[in-house]
Amino acid sequence: MNKLLPLFFINLENKIMKLPNYLYLLTIILYTSCNNNSDLVKKVAGMHQVIKTQYAPDKRVAVFDVHFNFSGDKMLASGMTDSKEAYLQLVASLKTMEIAFIDSIRVLPDTVVGNKMFAIARNSVINIRSAPKHSAELGTQGLLGMSLKILDKQGDFYRVQTPDRYISWVDKGGIQRMDKSEFNAWNNAKKVIFVKNYGYVFATKKSNAGIISDITLGGLLKYVSENATFYEVEYPDKRTGFIKKSESFIYKNWLQQLQPSKESIETIAKRMEGFPYLWGGTSSKGMDCSGFTKMVYLMNGFIIPRDASQQIKAGKAVDANLDFTTLEKGDLLFFGKKATTEKKQRVVHVGIWLGNDKMEFIHASGNVHTSSMNENEPNFDEMNKNRYLGSKRYLNVKSALIIDLKSKIKL
């Protein structure tokens, strides 16, 4: 073995660790092709890609960030994954290949998180970012009372997974950490859901009282008691307050009376008209295109994937001829760049078909508004008609990616 190889990888590591995994491994292969480890690295690279494709094909919902380099006469396997199965398969594969290696792989969550591996959102809306810093891109948002799984910690930020499986970072001020027993107690407790677009939790049973916090559409709090006009509620951090009954429901009762339909999809969607566009927004304070469709379906009793490029993978394909004739109210329309011989299809936008004679759909772009696919209508949307990719139907369709709130939700 080339004695300079370990030093070479140490010096090179800082530059190439930031590359995507496949480029990182390709770089290793190219630079080791003249030594005895090149065949070994190629085999490991192939094995790594197979496992990643099986367990973490989408890094937004799964973690498999594993790297390989050399330390002395042994290969060092480092990084992290949130899949114990992926880790075990990786280790077994390396042993089967009779590769001596140093195991420095973290299986999340681990001791960095401790026994409080769960959390509940404690603010009206929590901002969940792509990296552990306040200046990072907004990836998604969580609503008050939302259940979260904690995977990792870095500084004042926690890497969390939301019920739709999305993984990003939230600051410690937005969540109440819990151990498993506390988390189960919260989830099993009687709840109150807020059903108006925006409002307040009051300090006393008077609408002119001081406020404990604001609250937005879909927010959940623990039920304590009630009188004729207010529910007394408790936050995950034990604060208490009062919500107007006219703006909320007992969550269990709300779920039971839900009857998702084309009309209810349209009703909820139109209640959000004029809401501002916010990249990564998933609340009534602001929403992007897929955050809008996600909120509409949430208030109809379903958790759907977070991003448009994920939402297109759920449901039943409709409108094969791309002429809008077989669409029904409530179907999701997807837009973007069509596939070519060189590039895959790229989904960048989504809206909801309204099924009227104006050929209208409602979507978040600038703000939430209606547009038309009919060139004779004043709100004709030529740009989106030209980049229309197809549609999916969610209502009355069984799909592993569409979670019914009436079912037991696992984190």
Regions found by a protein language model. Name each.
Residues 269, 281-300:
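Active-site nucleophilic cysteine motif
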Residues 22-25, 34-76, 80-141, 146, ...:
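N-terminal targeting leaders
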Residues 121-147, 194-223, 277:
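Beta-loop motif signature
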Residues 304-370:
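...with weaker cross-activation on analogous glycine-rich loops/strands in unrelated enzymes
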Residues 84, 88-112, 162-193, 206, ...:
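Boundary regions of SH3-family modules and the immediately adjacent low-complexity/disordered segments
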Residues 1-42:
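Bacterial Sec-dependent N-terminal signal peptides
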